[in-house]
Every structure is written in C-alpha cells, then in structure tokens.
C-alpha cells in the first residue's frame, strides 16, 4: 500500500463499505489461466457436441480403453473419467459397468468385441503393445483388431487421457474416431495450437 491507498480504504471502512486490496498478482494470473482453460475446454466440448447432434446410440463405436501397454487386461470402463470423454467424443465404453484401472479377462474383451481399442499413454511401450495385440490369436476375432483400429493415446506434458489439463484436447482427439469425425484436420491442428499457445503463454 501507499499512504494514500491506505487512507482511502480507511475512509471506505468508516462509511461501512467493505473493500479488499490485493498485491498477489501471481494468484490473479492463475485465476485468469484457469478461466481461460475452462473456456477452452467448454468450447471444445460444444464444438464436438454440435457435430454429434442426431447421432443415435447404435451409431456410436464401442471403445475399449486399455490403461497401459504393459498390462493389456487393465482397462478403464464407462464408470470413469475415461468413459466420460469417450462418450463426449462420440463413442461409448464397451465395458460400461467397469470403473477406472480395473483388471478384466481376455474372454470378457472378446465377448464385448470393441470397434476401437485405445491404449493409454505408455511411452515407448505402446507400439509394442499394439503389435502384441495384432499377433495374439486370442484377439483376432475382435472388430478393432480385424479393422486395424488400435490407437495409442497421445501424451503431451502429461498423458492426455487422465488427470491432465490436456484433457481439453483429448475430447477433440477422441472425436477423430467417431462417425462424425472432423474431416478437416486443419481445424483440429488450429485448436491444438491455440490451446497450447493460450495456456502456456499465460503461465
């Protein structure tokens, strides 16, 4: 405070006017970053929702999300944040009653028969996991394997699929595998670049 500012707050208090002064500008900036992030996240959700209007449940691809490449039987089901972004992106969890990081049997996966398989961010292990699935006779009857629809989940500063600010991008990325996917990849890259620039620059 300067002397004049202190006197001003005293006068306000004398007249019953509540007031607050702040000098922690880092905190104020953090609030601005948070508000900007929420705007970006909600904007991406609305963008995808606008493309999914009229999409029937039976048109949504069933998605199996494998938690990590080192354990192909650990999955994230419909009762998890992963299941939520799958739904927002235009798909539906092939194991809707399972929660987060649950161990299932290969038989239950075969019976569920997912249209799409996504393997959670596993660094340099993810490609080996994809090849292992493709080579394993037990998985060959699954639609996602037969149609070569097995994908590695992206990683940025942190895996996009869980507990990350880049969850805002995850919804856009996941939408690429829905029936209403955005054929104009330029839009996706523009949104990706804008997100990275806006969130990073403001920190």
Model-derived regions: residue spans:
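Short, solvent-exposed coil/turn elements at secondary-structure transition points
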Residues: 69, 92, 99-100, 123, ...
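Short, glycine/charged-enriched secondary-structure capping and boundary segments
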Residues: 77-80, 132-134, 166-167
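Active-site phosphate/pyrophosphate- and oxyanion-stabilizing loops and adjacent acidic/basic residues
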Residues: 83-84, 107, 172
């Amino acid at each position: 405070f300067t002397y004049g500012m202190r006197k001003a707050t005293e006068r306000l208090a004398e007249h019953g006017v509540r007031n607050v002064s702040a000098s922690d500008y880092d905190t104020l900036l953090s609030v601005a970053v948070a508000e900007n992030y929420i705007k970006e996240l909600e904007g991406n959700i609305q963008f995808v929702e606008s493309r999914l209007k009229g999409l029937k449940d039976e048109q949504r691809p069933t998605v199996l999300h494998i938690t990590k490449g080192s354990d192909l039987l650990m999955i994230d089901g419909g009762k998890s944040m992963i299941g939520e972004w799958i739904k927002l992106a235009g798909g539906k969890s092939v194991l809707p009653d399972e929660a987060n990081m649950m161990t299932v049997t290969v038989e239950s996966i075969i019976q569920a028969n997912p249209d799409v398989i996504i393997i959670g961010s596993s660094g340099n292990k993810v490609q080996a996991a994809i090849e292992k699935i493709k080579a394993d006779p037990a998985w060959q009857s699954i639609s996602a394997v037969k149609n070569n629809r097995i994908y590695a989940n992206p990683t940025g500063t942190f895996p996009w699929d869980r507990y990350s600010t880049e969850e805002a991008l995850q919804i856009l990325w996941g939408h690429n595998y829905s029936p209403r996917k955005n054929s104009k990849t330029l839009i996706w890259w523009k949104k990706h670049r804008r997100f990275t620039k806006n969130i990073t620059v403001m920190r």
